[in-house]
Amino acid sequence: MRIKPLGDRVVIKRLEAEEKTKSGIVLPGSAKEKPQEAEIVAVGPGGLVDGKEVRMEVKVGDKVLFSKYSGTEVKLDGEEYTILRQNDILAIVE
């Protein structure tokens, strides 16, 4: 199944959190924070949003940092994704 976001929305797939601390301690699943780094898997067309022209600055495959509590989590074909607005993306990681 493909998902096509509308307007200035993007679909991201979170990158896995570290399983060990720098000192080598293994973290149980409940202790790991939600990762704030993700890969863009789909990008909306941009266009008029709230009466202003929005140009999409991210593309599929970009690695990004995003606001911790932003977006809507969805599950498709057993995979978890987050749909959020482009302005919830803080930076592109190069």
Swiss-Prot record:
Cellular component GO terms, alphabetically? cytoplasm
Q: Which molecular function terms from Gene Ontology are attached?
A: ATP binding; metal ion binding; protein folding chaperone; protein-folding chaperone binding; unfolded protein binding
Q: Which SUPFAM superfamilies match?
A: GroES-like
Describe its function: Together with the chaperonin GroEL, plays an essential role in assisting protein folding. The GroEL-GroES system forms a nano-cage that allows encapsulation of the non-native substrate proteins and provides a physical environment optimized to promote and accelerate protein folding. GroES binds to the apical surface of the GroEL ring, thereby capping the opening of the GroEL channel.
**What is said about its interaction partners and assembly?**
Heptamer of 7 subunits arranged in a ring. Interacts with the chaperonin GroEL.
PANTHER family membership: 10 KDA HEAT SHOCK PROTEIN (PTHR10772), CO-CHAPERONIN GROES (PTHR10772:SF58)
**Family membership noted in the UniProt record:** Belongs to the GroES chaperonin family.
Protein known as: Co-chaperonin GroES
